[in-house]
C-alpha cells in the first residue's frame, strides 16, 4: 500500500508538472505550438549561421529588431502587426546597411554588425523606456508566454512554413556558398542573392520568435541547438535533425520552467 501511495503521488506530481499546464490553459498550448514551429524553422537556420561563421551576425540581427519593434509599439501598442512589421523592417535595414558599409569601406561585415547592433539595442531600449512601462520593456526584451495568442501562433506557423520551403528550394546553392562562396559566384554569379534571401529568413524567424522569447533571446533557440549539435555530428542532415531535437527539448523544458517558477519565457528556454 505504501508503495502504491508513493507511486500515485509521483504520478500526480508528474501530471501537475508536465501535462496540467498544457491541459488547463490555452496560452500554454499556443506557446508550445509556437516553440515547436520555431524549433522546426529557426534551428536549421541556426545551422547555416554556424556553417557560414555568422553566429554573431544572428545575435546582431536579434538586437537590431528591437528599435523597429519599439517604434511599432509606440505606434500601435503591443499590436502584433505593428511590432512585427517594425521589427522586420529594422532588421532588414541593419543587414543591408552593414553589407553596404563593408562593401565600400575596409571594415568587414561582422565588425559593422557589432557596431550597428550595439547602437540599435541602445536606441530600442531608449524608445521603449520613453514610451512604455518596465513591464513592456521586459516583454519586448525577454518575451512572455502570456503574449502568445492565436494571431501570434499564426504568424509563427506562416514564418516556419515559408522558411522550411525556402530552405528546401535554395539548400544546395546556400550550402555551396557556405563552403566555397567564390566558386559559386564564378559558376552562376548569384552568391549575393542567396545571401540576401538567407538574411531575410534569419530576420523573419527572429521577428516570429519575439513574442515568446523576446528580441534578445529569440536568437538563442536559433544558435544554441545548432552549436550543441555541431559538437556531436558533422553530417549536414544529421546536424539539422539533431539541432531541431535539441530546440524542441529546450523549448518544452523552458516553457514548463517559466510557468512553474513564474519567470520570463525567453531566458528559461
Protein language model regions, located:
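Structural signature of hydrophobic alpha-helical transmembrane segments
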Residues: 28-39, 80-93, 157-158, 207-221, ...
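Short loop segments and helix-boundary regions at transmembrane helix junctions
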Residues: 47-62, 66-133, 229-241, 258-261
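Short juxtamembrane and helix-loop transition motifs at transmembrane-helix boundaries
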Residues: 17-26, 43-52, 72-82, 173-185, ...
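Transmembrane helix-bundle core of multi-pass membrane transporters
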Residues: 14-21, 28, 112-172
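Membrane-interfacial amphipathic/re-entrant helices at transmembrane-helix boundaries
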Residues: 2-40
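Transmembrane alpha-helical segments in multi-pass inner-membrane proteins
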Residues: 216-267
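Helix-loop-helix "hairpin" substructures at the membrane interface of multi-pass membrane proteins
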Residues: 153-222
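Generic alpha-helical transmembrane segments of integral inner-membrane proteins
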Residues: 36, 40, 44, 89-97, ...
Amino acid at each position: 500500500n505504501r508503495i502504491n501511495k508513493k507511486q500515485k503521488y509521483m504520478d500526480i506530481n508528474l501530471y501537475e508538472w508536465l501535462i496540467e499546464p498544457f491541459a488547463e490553459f490555452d496560452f500554454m498550448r499556443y506557446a508550445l505550438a509556437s516553440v515547436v514551429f520555431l524549433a522546426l524553422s529557426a534551428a536549421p537556420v541556426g545551422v547555416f549561421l554556424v556553417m557560414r561563421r555568422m553566429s554573431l551576425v544572428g545575435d546582431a540581427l536579434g538586437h537590431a529588431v528591437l528599435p523597429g519593434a519599439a517604434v511599432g509599439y509606440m505606434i500601435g501598442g503591443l499590436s502584433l502587426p505593428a511590432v512585427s512589421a517594425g521589427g522586420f523592417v529594422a532588421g532588414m535595414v541593419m543587414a543591408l546597411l552593414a553589407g553596404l558599409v563593408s562593401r565600400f569601406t575596409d571594415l568587414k561585415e561582422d565588425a559593422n554588425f557589432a557596431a550597428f547592433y550595439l547602437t540599435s539595442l541602445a536606441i530600442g531600449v531608449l524608445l521603449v523606456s520613453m514610451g512604455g512601462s518596465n513591464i513592456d520593456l521586459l516583454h519586448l526584451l525577454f518575451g512572455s508566454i502570456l503574449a502568445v495568442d492565436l494571431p501570434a501562433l499564426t504568424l509563427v506557423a506562416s514564418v516556419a512554413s515559408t522558411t522550411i520551403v525556402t530552405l528546401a528550394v535554395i539548400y544546395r546553392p546556400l550550402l555551396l556558398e557556405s563552403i566555397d562562396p567564390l566558386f559559386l559566384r564564378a559558376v552562376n554569379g548569384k552568391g549575393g542573392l542567396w545571401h540576401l534571401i538567407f538574411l531575410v529568413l534569419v530576420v523573419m524567424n527572429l521577428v516570429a520568435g519575439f513574442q515568446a522569447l523576446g528580441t534578445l533571446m529569440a536568437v538563442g533557440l536559433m544558435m544554441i541547438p545548432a552549436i550543441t549539435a555541431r559538437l556531436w555530428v558533422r553530417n549536414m542532415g544529421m546536424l539539422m535533425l539533431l539541432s531541431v531535437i535539441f530546440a524542441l527539448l529546450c523549448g518544452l523544458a523552458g516553457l514548463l520552467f517559466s510557468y512553474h517558477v513564474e519567470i520570463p519565457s525567453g531566458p528559461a528556454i
